[in-house]
């Protein structure tokens, strides 16, 4: 019996520090809850010429945020007001702060890489990314709703 208690005590002395070290955390926020495929469900622009519902006009934005920090997807901006249609690849990377601010790094020069998005959830508990920023007098408001997890 004494030998068994000594063995148990020895295992605890050796095993407990190993367990504690294995559970060490990171200062970086977890990206796993944010990862998933998102699509624009609200996409408005407004400026001197008025407000435009970009989804109704034919614009789309779909982006997949992988758990490893990479992105894929596509942005299509419908032609309007003499501006031609724009198509852009959303390939790149994404990061999130502990305050749930998501930013994108992409080679495509679009508002997506220059707008911080806030991660949260809608009234039904579905993950959303919301962005709202003014670029050269045009306000862009976007809500991306997660369709699936990655």
Whereabouts are the PLM-identified features?
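Bacterial N-terminal signal peptides that target proteins for export
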Residues: 1-12
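C-terminal motif of bacterial Sec signal peptides marking the signal peptidase cleavage site
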Residues: 19-22
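N-terminal helix-cap/turn-to-beta initiation motif at the start of protein domains
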Residues: 24-39, 64, 149-150
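Generic short beta-strand segments
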Residues: 39-46, 70-79, 107-108, 130-134
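N-terminal glycine/threonine-rich, aromatic-flanked beta-hairpin/loop signature
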Residues: 52-100
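An anionic, turn-rich surface loop/hairpin at beta-sheet edges
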Residues: 55, 101-119
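Short, solvent-exposed coil/turn segments at beta-strand boundaries
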Residues: 62-72, 96-100, 117-129, 146-150
